[in-house]
Amino acid sequence: MTLDLDAHKKDDKLLITTIQQEYKILAEYKMIESEKLSGIYVIPSYANSLQWFGVFFGRQGLYAESVFRFTILLPDRFPDDKSLPTIIFQQDVIHPHVCPYTHSLDVSHAFPEWRCGEDHLWQLLKYLQVIFSDPLDSIRGIEVDKLKNREAAELLMNNKEEYVARVQENIKESKEHIFDTPPTEDPHYIVFEKFQQDVHGPVLERIKAGRSKQTEPSAQQGNGGHATGLSWVKEGEFKPLSIE
């Protein structure tokens, strides 16, 4: 009987810990919504809140017009663990801070460790936005040997023309795969559809008129209140249509 009681107490404690973690993760998502980061859309997986789906739209600089999908993996004890969240791109992305083998983004130069209550996911996404806006400035003061992609750093500093050409290859590839079939059946995976006048035209007109009640793709709701991750892109362009 004592063993049964101890087991129940352990299960109850685990349940409470899990619920508390879910609330903390939800709070992180709400903060991201309130920050209204331009060109970055993220949403937690429906099946696992420790896995997030994201898309980065380059708006300026060398990476303008890029559409890079990425995944965020949170540590098991997030946000209480000092371990850093992991951002992994789904394709080759040439950048001094992106590993050419794993496609993971090195955030350790901005976040040596995760400080619960001080560091937040919106700051991580803002960092992603900043380093793509000005990659050269992002490596200023950092030894080349400490960068994830030394070759990219050397090209950026010494052969910018070749670096730009490599970036353009990445951008071209990203656009070619924007409408690919989702690699997962998770309903929160961010999906983009080609513009269809009969389906999306009326919505576009409401947006233009300032009457649209839609939220951005990272928080679109459907299926009984659950976010579907569904968005759409105007034909000939590679950015989601929104009120922004």
Curated annotation (Swiss-Prot):
Domain annotation UBC core: ranges: 20-176
PROSITE patterns: UBC_2 (PS50127)
An example Gene Ontology biological process: defense response to bacterium
Name of one Pfam family that matches: UQ_con
Cross-referenced Gene3D superfamilies: Ubiquitin Conjugating Enzyme
Domain of life: Eukaryota
Spans annotated as Disordered: 209-244
Family of this protein: Belongs to the ubiquitin-conjugating enzyme family. FTS subfamily.
The protein's name: Protein crossbronx
Species annotation: Drosophila simulans (Fruit fly)
